[in-house]
Design a protein with these regions (language model features):
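N-terminal amphipathic alpha-helix/helix-capping segment at the start of soluble metabolic enzymes
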Residues: 1-22, 31-33, 142
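Single conserved hydrophobic/aromatic residue that forms the stacking wall/gate
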Residues: 181-191
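A generic structural micro-environment signature
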Residues: 14, 18, 53, 94, ...
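Alpha/beta enzyme core
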Residues: 5, 26-55, 60-75, 86, ...
Length: 191
């Protein structure tokens, strides 16, 4: 059986670049598949905005994200990448989050380096945890995997607050996670 993580890895291998389209619900996911997209993305803002009419300010829970994820993965075979924000708690909670995402047939997640009471990554005035705490989050996520093909990305929101050098320094610390994502680079050249 090909796991969702393997599907995601294959999509990355086959598509340069892989365009991962946002889908806030099962219907959007089906439309994305019909349009020929190869992978889907559910953002934290997507869950907060589309499911609850709320801003992306750490208001939603693991259960909210897991439920929306299940609805999407039950409607399509496309691999789904999920924004798990800061992981919904400390190390044990992050490990549980990963298990829940795998159980929901999610292919991949990204975990960010903001404080638990986070803001949308595209908004100003973000506060970040230190590099050691984020490295511990990544380790907890990796340790929580029950499927080695499950894809974990580390995301840094440090560009706006620490500049390019700070973002690169953080990425070097987070390299263990397989893939890095900086959400607030000013342009394509910086990212």
């Amino acid at each position: 059986m090909i796991t969702p993580g393997k599907k995601f890895r294959q999509a990355i291998s086959d598509n340069h670049p892989l365009m991962v389209v946002g889908a806030v619900n099962a219907y959007c996911a089906k439309m994305a598949g019909d349009a020929g997209h190869k992978a889907l993305y559910l953002s934290g803002a997507g869950v907060a905005n589309a499911s609850f009419g709320l801003p992306d300010l750490a208001i939603t829970t693991l259960n909210d994200v897991a439920e929306d994820s299940r609805r999407i993965t039950q409607a399509t075979d496309l691999p789904l990448l999920i924004d798990i924000d800061t992981g919904f708690g400390g190390a044990f909670s992050i490990s549980r989050t990963i298990k829940e995402m795998i159980s929901a047939d999610v292919a991949a997640v990204h975990l960010e380096d903001q404080v638990t009471q986070k803001r949308c990554g595209h908004r100003p005035n973000k506060s970040l945890v230190d590099k050691i705490e984020m490295s511990d989050r990544i380790k907890a996520a990796v340790d929580g995997r029950t499927d080695e093909s499950f894809f974990i990305m580390a995301r840094t929101d440090s560009y706006a607050t620490e500049g390019m050098t700070g973002a690169i320094d953080r990425c070097k610390e987070y390299i263990e996670s397989c893939l890095l994502y900086t959400s607030d680079a000013a342009d394509e050249e910086d990212s």
